[in-house]
Amino acid sequence: MNLFQNAKFFTTVNHLKDLPDTPLEIAFVGRSNAGKSSAINTLTNHVRLAYVSKTPGRTQHINFFELQNGNFMVDLPGYGYAQVPEAVRAHWVNLLGDYLRHRKELIGLVLIMDARHPLKELDIRMLDFFHTTGRPVHILLSKADKLSKNEQIKTLSQVKKLLKPYSDRQNISVQLFSSLKKQGIDEANRTVGSWFDAADAAASSPEEN
């Protein structure tokens, strides 16, 4: 089953106080222009569920989409785009940081990186920041179609090696992904679906005395 199929727009917020009541959430985040919106549209099999723009920094709010299992997917503002007023950029940073740190309904993070330029400084900072929550991270190496098959294999191997210090201390995984070639959809579904399954199992388990 495609977990993301038939996802529906729910609401958009610009302040933490306006966050909706939801059961469970997984969030998508990435550098501006890493292909986050295209990845969301590909996973949901929807042409324009998330707005795709050639202008970095288009996603400026926290956008909520309801999944068919009743839980939610959250599209977070991209980071690393400097061509906006400083006050606006500071608001994005605070909004993003506070959401990731304090949102109790959040069970995992999908981090989008351009396969041609993975693990940039801000990506590393995001991993370090989110590590403190103890929640899992799944990395989509987007735009994999821009690489040859050999380059894809080499890039995936290199990224896994660089992620070893993180994977030793938290649940972190990585895969190749291409919106153009529809590559990696099933793998992303399995990984994120396992997060919801684990959260549901934990919630239904009797508390230990």
Swiss-Prot record:
One of its GO terms (molecular function) is metal ion binding. CDD domains: YihA_EngB (cd01876). InterPro entries: G_ENGB_dom, GTP-bd, GTP-bd_ribosome_bio_YsxC, P-loop_NTPase. Pfam families: MMR_HSR1 (PF01926). Keywords: Cell cycle, Cell division, GTP-binding, Magnesium, Metal-binding, Nucleotide-binding, Septation. GO terms for biological process: division septum assembly. Residues 22-198 form the EngB-type G domain. Signal peptide: none annotated. Mg(2+) binds at S37, T59. It comes from the Bacteria. Its cofactor is Mg(2+). GO terms for cellular component: cytosol. Necessary for normal cell division and for the maintenance of normal septation. Belongs to the TRAFAC class TrmE-Era-EngA-EngB-Septin-like GTPase superfamily. EngB GTPase family. This is Probable GTP-binding protein EngB.
